[in-house]
């Protein structure tokens, strides 16, 4: 069976990139593909400047299929359509061949010291633990580093997994600044009606009265 991967957002009103079967080789498999016919993409930095291939920033799109705007929300529309490009809120990069690689949502990125930490990478590692049903990774306040990594975990029924054993298990599986410094065990991760994980709900108890550098 030949598998074709596509990627799009509600705001793109359909698929915007495609990774056809013939490109399922080597590192290209980690990509969501290249923009489809009539679509364009680029990656921008903190000041909306264009970034070179391989550098992580915000993925932006342009094309005829993009939304006109958010209903009755002109300010929100203006914020995401700066410079006639749709700013997706996705962090990622484009390689020299024009393939797009998504790292995470920018608002979920953790700023720990001088490092940008992408929760999706950590979640993928933790999810491979046999005692973990599902997990989420968030940033919580830290006086020294600004933010540190916390894992929120749903473990299998009857599991004896502890915070200490999970942190030790992760020690040789990821860089030190990516490893969780603390773990919460809960019965169920919060989700909205469509099943989307609500990381803001997980972060809120730790950030009351404080301001994140990422929002």
PLM regions and their residue ranges:
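AMP-binding/adenylate-forming catalytic core of the ANL superfamily
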Residues: 47-50, 63, 68-69, 76-79, ...
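Acidic/polar alpha-helix N-cap and adjacent early helical turns
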Residues: 205-215
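Short Gly/Pro-enriched turn/cap motifs at secondary-structure boundaries
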Residues: 30-36, 50, 80-84
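Gly/Ser/Thr-rich phosphate-binding loop
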Residues: 1-27, 40, 47-48
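AMP-binding/adenylate-forming core of the ANL superfamily
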Residues: 42, 53-67, 85, 91-92
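Active-site glycine-centered loops adjacent to acidic/histidine catalytic or metal-binding residues
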Residues: 8, 33, 90, 114
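General small-molecule cofactor/ligand-binding pocket signal
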Residues: 4, 183-186
